[in-house]
Amino acid sequence: MNPISVDNVVTTYRFYAPLYDRLFGAAFEPGRRALTQAVRNLRPSSLLEVGVGTGLTLSQYPSTSRIVGIDISTHMLDIARERASKLPNHDIKLAAMNAESMDFPDGSFDCIAMPYVLSVTPNPEKLVAEIRRVCRKGGTILILNHFSGSRFWWFLERAVRSLADKIGFRSDFCFDEQILKYDWEIESVKKVNVFGLSKLVVIRNT
């Protein structure tokens, strides 16, 4: 598999930004709804969404939360800003930022939401270290992502691997290696999306 670089991610999403909602909106919406429902149940005073993209989740977050969304793609953020402008009752700030090196002080947020990001970042371990740093101790981290391992994924990974390499997407992404190896507290794991191909992982930051 070709290594993912920041330039690769930026170039990919410059191309996909106008098409993203049509290609990935409905297909991944069940997972997004599960994630935003979890956030509404938590009602955090402050929320950071890492990889806010085109802002598909913004309207589903509680209006009582201070919401910050970051993305490395300015083209995706342009669409997110248009969405945010139609939510006058929400406190939303959006910024272009590399999530592997964030500008926020330690413990800045009660809750971190990270939908469909972990498998497209150049360095997942560095990203995890950063989200743990900016989430307060005892806060909640929500990771929504596909993970490999099922028989269906075994076939799908091989079918899409060549394309995935070209667009900077890890099709072979192991749950044990990417989630279980850390010394955080996993509160729940829920299968979401068609065939349960993705998981919503709720984590207590320790």
Residue ranges of model-derived segments:
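Conserved class I S-adenosyl-L-methionine
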Residues: M1-R43, L56, F155-S162, N193-G196
